[in-house]
Every structure is written in C-alpha cells, then in structure tokens.
A protein has these predicted regions:
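FAD-binding core/adjacent interface of flavoenzyme oxidoreductases
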Residues: 1-5, 23, 73-140
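Beta1-alpha1 glycine-rich phosphate/pyrophosphate-binding loop at the start
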Residues: 2-60, 64-67, 140-141
Length: 141
C-alpha cells in the first residue's frame, strides 16, 4: 500500500488525510501543536455548524474523523526530510518515518506586531482577520 506522511495537523492536513485514507493510502499525520485554529475561541461562520464551536473542538472532531477512517496521528516535531530512491525519510524529534510521498500542510504563522501587552487584548479588540472577526464587533463602539 502506498504511504503518505502529511506534515501539519490543521484543517488542510486533516482534510488531506481523510481523502487520502479513503483513496487507499496508508497515512500518517505529523503535527507539533494545535496551530492558529487551536487558539481560536469562537467559530460562527463554518458551514455545517449552526452553533458556535471553538477551534480546539473543530480540530478534535477532525482528528477523530481521520483516526476513525484509519489515519495515524502523531504529535511530534519534524526536523528534516530527505529523499532517496526508495522514497522519503521524515525525521522527527521522536524518530524517523518513511513514505512514498510527503504532503506539506503547515499553515501560516500569524504576524503579531511587536507591541507590549498586545496578547492580552487578542479577541477583545485586537483581531488579525477582518473578514472573520468583523461580525463580533458590529454595533460596538
């Protein structure tokens, strides 16, 4: 069975894992943390969720679905990737995994301005996504 290592356990990585497992691949998802989605308090604009859901809960559901279908999830940090004639060697902090293919779904880092105390106001006036967060501030001064 062809093997796939997906680096990144956010929405893109988990969606890819679900599709790849259903296509008959042996899939391992490697992720080091919950990323930006895991820090999101309220999601109100995601199709299929009529009630507010947290990013952590959405990730939890996505992981459960991927695992139920057969993907293997590992919380670890990738330290390198090497390619040889036999495929890829993905080096992590807890060992090495081999795969026929590697998919990178590492997301993008949030650009936080270097302003003292800014973190304490995130979600309480400081926002990084106008399209996502504008609704929360409608009608407020």
């Amino acid at each position: 069975m062809p093997t796939l290592v997906i680096i990144g356990g956010g929405p893109a990585g988990l969606s890819a894992a679900i599709y790849a497992v259903r296509a008959g691949l042996d899939v391992q998802v490697l992720y080091k943390d919950d990323g930006a989605l895991g820090k999101t308090d309220k999601i109100e604009n995601y199709f299929g969720f009529p009630d507010v859901i947290s990013g952590a809960e959405l990730l939890s559901r996505g992981r459960a679905q991927a695992e139920r279908l057969g993907a293997q999830l590992h919380r670890t940090e990738v330290t390198g990737i090497e390619y040889a004639d036999t495929g890829f060697a993905v080096k992590t902090t807890d060992g090495e995994r081999h795969a026929d293919a590697v998919l990178l779904a590492t997301g993008s880092p949030r650009a936080v301005p270097d302003i003292t105390g800014i973190r304490e106001f995130e979600g309480r006036g400081v926002s990084y996504c106008a399209v996502c967060d504008a609704f929360f501030y409608r009608g407020k001064d």
